[in-house]
């Protein structure tokens, strides 16, 4: 049992970081233990906090509650719409100190940084192979299983890779998820 007092907040036994909130403390400790008690009943992916599994569920339900006021595009996550809004303003707030390249999306910037560090943050539990990019890692994982995690609600076609599933959705909606700005400017 974790004890605390007014003077002594919840303190991580692994790194000493202190928390005033029990929920934040328990979630933090899971970063050290690797415990992931929240499992998706659709695909089996596990998470260390309940809010993460609620956000993840949107992949399976197709829910996109965040709508861009400028163009009407819908997003699953609040962070995605914040990053998207930079495409309207042209703002690129994330700049690499190593090479000066700037990014609209913080996630693209974090991935770009790995070019300089060589960091490989994704490791396959099945074979131990490591990957720099999440897309390569997720594609690799499907080589170990025949399970398809993403199923189209319109036609039932299933995909093991989210990007392939997302591209397929355009067959039914007419949406083209990737737009070539060079081609668009030539028209």
UniProtKB/Swiss-Prot annotation:
A GO CC term assigned to this protein in UniProt:
nucleus
Mind telling me which Pfam families this protein's record contains?
zf-C2H2 (PF00096)
Alphabetized SMART domains for the sequence: ZnF_C2H2
According to its UniProt entry, the protein's GO biological process terms are: regulation of gene expression
Give UniProt keywords alphabetically: Metal-binding, Repeat, Zinc, Zinc-finger
A molecular function annotated in GO for this UniProt entry is: zinc ion binding
PROSITE patterns according to UniProt: ZINC_FINGER_C2H2_1 (PS00028), ZINC_FINGER_C2H2_2 (PS50157)
- SUPFAM superfamilies with a match to the protein in the record: beta-beta-alpha zinc fingers
Note the InterPro entries from the entry.
Znf_C2H2_sf, Znf_C2H2_type
User: C2H2-type zinc fingers: which residues?
Assistant: 10-32, 38-60, 66-88, 94-116, 122-144, 150-172
| Protein's UniProt name | Putative zinc finger protein 833
What is the species of this protein?
Answer: Homo sapiens
């Amino acid at each position: 049992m974790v004890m605390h007092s007014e003077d002594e907040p919840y303190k991580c036994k692994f790194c000493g970081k202190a928390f005033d909130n029990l929920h934040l403390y328990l979630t933090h400790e899971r970063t050290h233990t690797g415990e992931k008690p929240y499992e998706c009943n659709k695909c089996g992916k596990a998470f260390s906090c309940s809010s993460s599994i609620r956000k993840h569920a949107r992949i399976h339900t197709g829910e996109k509650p965040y709508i861009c006021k400028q163009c009407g595009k819908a997003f699953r996550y609040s962070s995605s719409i914040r990053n998207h809004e930079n495409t309207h303003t042209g703002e690129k707030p994330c700049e690499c100190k190593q090479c000066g390249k700037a990014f609209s999306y913080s996630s693209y910037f974090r991935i770009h940084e790995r070019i300089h560090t060589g960091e490989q943050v994704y490791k396959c539990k099945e074979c131990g192979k490591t990957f720099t990019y999440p897309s390569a890692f997720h594609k690799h994982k499907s080589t170990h299983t025949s399970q398809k995690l993403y199923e189209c609600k319109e036609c039932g076609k299933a995909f093991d890779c989210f990007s392939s599933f997302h591209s397929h959705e355009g067959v039914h909606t007419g949406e083209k998820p990737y737009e070539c700005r060079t081609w668009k400017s030539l028209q």
